[in-house]
Amino acid sequence: MQVNDLGFIATILFVLVPTVFLLILYIQTRKETEG
């Protein structure tokens, strides 16, 4: 099975972007709750 480079990059971005976004939100809320 040949891997389509564009599809592979799109899949990585599709997974990575929401994960990074959630991590940033999580860290920001933790800093606020810690004071």
UniProtKB/Swiss-Prot annotation:
Pfam families: PsbM. Keywords: Membrane, Photosynthesis, Photosystem II, Reaction center, Thylakoid, Transmembrane, Transmembrane helix. One of its GO terms (cellular component) is photosystem II. Its main location: membrane. The chain crosses the membrane at residues 7-27. GO terms for biological process: photosynthesis, light reaction. PANTHER family: PHOTOSYSTEM II REACTION CENTER PROTEIN M. Belongs to the PsbM family. This is Photosystem II reaction center protein M. It comes from Rippkaea orientalis (strain PCC 8801 / RF-1) (Cyanothece sp. (strain PCC 8801)).
